[in-house]
Curated annotation (Swiss-Prot):
EC number: 5.3.1.23
Gene Ontology molecular-function annotations: S-methyl-5-thioribose-1-phosphate isomerase activity
Matching InterPro entries: IF-2B-related, IF-M1Pi, IF_2B-like_C, Initiation_fac_2B_a/b/d, M1Pi_N, NagB/RpiA_transferase-like
Identification of the protein by name: Methylthioribose-1-phosphate isomerase
Entry keywords, A to Z: Amino-acid biosynthesis, Cytoplasm, Isomerase, Methionine biosynthesis, Nucleus
Protein's UniProt keywords contain Manganese: no
Length: 382
């Protein structure tokens, strides 16, 4: 990938809180591995660059990687000057590239969901187009709509979540929220999911304090979430992952809000490793535990979380400091187990906050997500 440090006037200061900077034919991704100490954008010229950026954690967060993948291919086909195939050839090319991009990170359903939706656009375009350029144009426009829709979706999640939590909790004027990993502007096209709810609570004047975990081993909480909270001037405290239970015991947490990489039909949720531990602690201390995610994170094809494929990351992330980017800190020869995600069972989750509203349980332990999706299918995001 070409390297383009942020030293000119093209990218303004506030863009440091945008992981995706796109204009038709051009895509730059903020290298989140270097935050918060260095701001650097990488030029993404094609789907190969996009795959590498996602796999190597240049960009992360389920919504963000879906958008980045789609746009990396949009940039590639926009800049084609030597494609001589038919409309069907163009469709075949796009299908193969989308499958390739989906393989970059298998746990996040947003990526495969975006690919499937884009394939539908490609099918329709190829059936009526007279040339390859028309198919490529249809794809580019669809990818750009996804970028726009993600921002609107995130703001709706924030609004629904803030209203719901204020109505559910005691003393809603003095809320302290604990979150895990990074679910803000850097993990999405903008605003954020779980962190978007925290932003909305702060804007409403009811947030006393946000707590963010460091989120080892890649430190998305200490490097990214803390960075966003400081930038937004939201009162916040960083805690070690291992301090979360003690924080809850000391009655410092009103609710826990996390994001999601994949939600099964029954509500079981795959999210950053350590989420399950937080949910167990929250239940023990009678603290509500919420998942905030767009409906694109829901995978109705999976009946439960036992079917979710969990990505395992490089041992180097544990063996070396700075999530694998620094010097070795562990003994040579030690074996490593480094799952990127865990699955929190639905019985530990109080509600799932989406852009269409909050999914609550039909009884003590079960969510009827299929019915919620069906019931809100024609409902606009607001």
């Amino acid at each position: 990938m070409a390297n383009n440090s942020n030293s000119g006037s093209e990218l303004e200061v506030d863009d440091t809180l945008q992981s995706i900077c796109y204009n038709r034919g051009s895509l730059k991704l903020l290298d989140q591995r270097k935050l918060p100490l260095e701001t650097e954008f990488l030029d993404i010229r094609n789907s190969s660059d996009g795959w590498s950026a996602i796999r190597e954690m240049v960009v992360r967060g389920a919504p963000a990687i879906a958008i980045a993948a789609a746009l990396s291919l949009a940039v590639e086909v926009f800049n084609f000057d030597d494609f001589t195939g038919t409309s069907n050839d163009a469709a075949s090319f796009l299908f193969k590239k989308l499958e390739y991009l989906v393989s970059s990170r298998p746990t996040a359903v947003n990526l495969s969901d975006a690919a499937n939706k884009l394939k539908e656009v490609i099918y329709k375009a190829a059936a009526t187009a007279s040339d390859s350029n028309s198919v490529f144009q249809a794809y580019i426009e669809a990818a750009e709509i996804m970028l726009k829709d993600d921002i609107a979706s995130n703001k709706a999640i924030g609004s629904h979540g803030a209203s719901f939590i204020q109505n559910q909790l005691k003393n809603p004027q003095r809320l302290s929220i604990l979150t895990h990993c990074n679910t803000g502007s850097l993990a999405t096209a903008g605003y954020g999911t779980a962190l978007g709810v925290i932003r909305a609570l702060h804007a409403a004047g009811v947030l006393r304090r946000a707590y963010c975990t460091e989120t080892r081993p890649f430190n998305q909480g200490s490097r990214l979430t803390a960075f966003e909270l400081v930038h937004e001037k939201i009162p916040a405290t960083l805690v070690a992952d291992s301090a979360a239970a003690a924080l809850m015991k000391d009655d410092q947490v009103s609710a826990v809000i996390v994001g999601a990489d994949r939600v099964a039909a029954n509500g079981d949720t795959a999210n950053k490793i350590g989420t399950y531990s937080l949910a167990l602690c929250a239940m023990h201390h009678n603290i509500p535990f919420y998942v905030a995610a767009p409906l694109t994170s829901v995978d109705l094809s999976l009946s439960s979380g036992k079917h979710i494929v969990i990505e395992e990351r490089s041992p180097k992330e544990l063996l070396n400091s700075r999530g694998g980017l620094g010097e070795q800190v562990a003994a040579s020869g030690i074996s490593v187990w480094n799952p990127a995600f865990d699955v929190t069972p639905a019985n530990l989750i109080s509600g799932i906050i989406t852009e269409k509203g909050v999914i609550t349980k039909i009884d003590s332990s079960d969510f009827d997500i299929k019915n919620f999706v069906k019931r809100t299918a024609g409902q606009s995001v607001a």
